[in-house]
Amino acid sequence: MTYEEIYSQFYSKETDPTFFKKYSKDEAYELMKDWLHSIVAIPFVRKCFSTITLDDEILELKFQLKNSVDEESDNYFVKNLFAHGLKICCMQKQIDTSVSLATVIGAKEEKTILNNYKNNELRLEQLEIQFRKFIRDHVYINNDYIGEE
C-alpha cells in the first residue's frame, strides 16, 4: 500500500481547510510521513500487525495483520486506521500551537484570544476514543475464538 493511498483517505476525513493552506504538498507529505511512524509506534496499533514496515524510500507500507480477513478488507482497515491516526496527529499539532495557547494582557486582567482550547482538547479525546474503538472492534470481530457461523 502506498503512502499516497493513506494520504488520500486522510484528505477525505480532514475537515480543517487551514491544513491544506498552511503547507505545501511536499511539506504536508513530510509531516504526514513522520506522523505515520508515530502511529506505528503506538503499542495498541503495532499489536494489530504480525509484520509492518514503512519504506520511506519508495513511500510504501507493507503489512500483515494478525487477524486478517481478506486482502481488500485488510487494505480498507489499514487505510482507515492510519487516516484516523493522521487526523489525531494533525489535531494535536493544531492544539499545541502558540495561537491556541496565547493570552492577551489587557487593562487589569488576562484574556484569551480564542477560548476554544478546552473544546479542542475534548474533541481530540473523542477522536482517540473512536480510534481505540475502531481497532478494538476489528480485533474482536475477526478474532479466532469467535469462529465463523
Name these PLM-found stretches.
Residues 1-74, 137-149:
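Conserved short "hinge" loops at termini or chain/domain junctions
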Residues 48, 90-102:
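Short, solvent-exposed secondary-structure capping/transition elements
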Residues 75-95:
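Elongated alpha-helical scaffolds
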Residues 81, 88, 110, 114-117, ...:
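Amphipathic alpha-helical coiled-coil segments with heptad-repeat character
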Residues 115-149:
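Polybasic, proline/glycine-rich intrinsically disordered low-complexity segments
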